[in-house]
């Protein structure tokens, strides 16, 4: 089950870097922020100040999590 997250401007104001430690992920480690909410996992990747790629994934197990990006301008 895949959903696209809707982000507000305030969600895009903070630029953070973290390394994804989950197996099977191929995201750029120093340009990705991982946010966990319940069973929902967000992967936010900043390309520049105006463009963010985000994947919003609901996964029952960690091994099924994949990096799927959607452009949000």
UniProtKB/Swiss-Prot annotation:
Compartments (UniProt record): Membrane
Keywords of this entry: Membrane, Transmembrane, Transmembrane helix
First-listed, main subcellular location of the protein, grouped into a coarse class: membrane
UniProt topology in membrane: Single-pass membrane protein
A GO cellular-component term linked to this record: membrane
Transmembrane intervals: 54-72
Name the UniProt record assigns to this protein: Putative uncharacterized protein YJL156W-A
Organism, as annotated: Saccharomyces cerevisiae (strain ATCC 204508 / S288c) (Baker's yeast)
């Amino acid at each position: 089950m895949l959903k696209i997250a809707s982000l507000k401007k305030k969600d895009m104001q903070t630029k953070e870097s973290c390394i994804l430690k989950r197996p099977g992920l191929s995201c750029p480690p120093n340009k990705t922020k991982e946010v966990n909410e319940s069973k929902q996992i967000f992967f936010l990747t900043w390309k520049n100040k105006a463009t963010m790629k985000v994947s919003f994934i609901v996964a029952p197990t960690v091994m099924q999590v994949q990096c799927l990006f959607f452009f949000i301008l």
